A protein has these predicted regions:
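General structural signal for secondary-structure boundaries
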Residues: 87-97, 108, 168, 250-258, ...
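Conserved alpha-helical substructure of the radical SAM core
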Residues: 3-16, 21-144, 148-154, 158
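Radical SAM/AdoMet-radical enzyme domain recognition
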Residues: 95-114, 122-236
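Radical SAM enzyme [4Fe-4S]-AdoMet core and its adjacent flexible, acidic
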Residues: 183, 191-317
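Phenylalanine-focused residue identity feature
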Residues: 10, 19-22, 74-75, 85-87, ...
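Generic structural motif
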Residues: 12, 65, 174, 237, ...
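Ordered hydrophobic segments in well-structured contexts
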Residues: 1, 5-7, 307-311
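A short acidic, helix-capping loop that chelates divalent metal ions and anchors anionic groups
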Residues: 80-82, 175-179, 242-245
Length: 317
């Protein structure tokens, strides 16, 4: 344990209050893999009946190996570090986890993110994807740095045919300085996705004082590749206690901070008031469910966990 600490959670009180008006509890998961009488939160983590939301996008870590060593990554472990080990579930374990996901009620999990590490380091990654499809998952996206797809377009074709719908592509900035890990490879990875009909979501890890001045540039680059890039998911860096307070304050950035910078860097084209928390879609879900009389997919996460907006390109201006 790390003891007590004080951290900035949400950078705007006004936005917090506005977002809180959209807070709605979901149905929860009625077939949890951790029973309530065994729960000792947070000592035995898992989906228990205390959860008020079902799995929206399930994440499966298929390896903790990576071909990069990004300093801010909470998965990155230096070689030789005491306690470090390789995690890589077998195909049988992958199938067992998929069966657990699909057993959730009232909404069987049907959306999966393959993550790591770098998933493409697994030689049997195509088999992993096929198992997910065999177990009934509709949507599969892969969290990746894209380097393999840039160097080997055939690999993109193989995972697409196996069942991957979308690349969740790490992309931290529009310059080599802010995005040293895959700056040169991203254009080639996009071309591989374009040729195979695979959509892309840019996933910038936003770090204050490092790349928070390029959020508008990232949006504009996505716009230039609108035929293949359908979204940008800005993720404020997760500082997991490996650095001191001064360092954390130097790099810490919250969702409202990102939204404010986007307004500034898009010259007001995307304003602070354009953003809504994830559960703002819940009333529409409830209406559709009322008409269909069947449980519908809910996005009932906490209102401070994320925000979104839509941007439309006007061809006439």
């Amino acid at each position: 344990t790390h003891g007590e600490c004080e951290e900035l959670y949400f950078g705007s009180y006004e936005m917090y209050k506005r977002f809180s008006t959209y807070w709605m509890d979901g149905k929860g998961a009625h077939a949890p893999n951790v029973m309530i009488d065994k729960c000792s939160c947070p000592n035995n983590c898992g989906l228990c009946s205390n959860h008020l939301s079902h799995s929206g996008l399930a994440n499966m870590i298929v390896t903790n190996r990576c071909d990069l060593t990004c300093w801010y990554c909470f998965f990155y472990v230096k070689k030789g570090l005491e306690g470090a080990y390789m995690y890589e579930p077998s195909l049988d374990q992958v199938r067992a986890m998929m069966k657990t996901l699909r057993a959730e009620r009232p909404i069987p999990g049907n959306s999966m993110q393959i993550t790591g590490g770098e998933p493409m380091l697994r030689e049997d990654i195509v088999d992993v994807i096929k198992i997910m499809k065999e177990e009934g998952v509709d949507h599969i996206q892969m969290n990746t740095n894209g380097i393999r797809f840039a160097l080997d377009p055939e690999a993109m074709r193989e995972v697409r045919l196996a069942g991957v719908n979308n690349l969740y592509l790490s992309f931290d900035g529009v310059t080599a300085r802010t995005n040293p890990k895959n700056h040169w490879e991203v254009p080639y990875a996009l071309e591989s996705a374009r040729k195979t009909g695979t959509t892309v979501v840019f996933v910038p890890t936003v770090i204050k004082s490092i790349n928070d001045h390029e959020l508008g540039g990232i949006i504009r680059y996505a716009q230039k590749n609108l035929d293949v890039v359908h979204a940008v998911n800005f993720q404020p860096v997760s500082l997991t206690g490996r650095m001191g307070k001064k360092e954390r304050e130097k790099y810490r950035i919250t969702i409202p901070d990102c939204i404010q910078r986007i307004e500034e860097q898009t010259n007001g084209e995307v304003t602070i008031d354009d953003w809504f928390p994830v559960p703002s879609c819940m009333p529409l879900t409830n209406v559709i469910e009322a008409f269909s009389s069947k449980p519908k997919y809910e996005l009932s996460i906490h209102f401070a966990c994320g925000a979104g907006t839509y941007i439309f390109e006007d061809q006439e201006t």
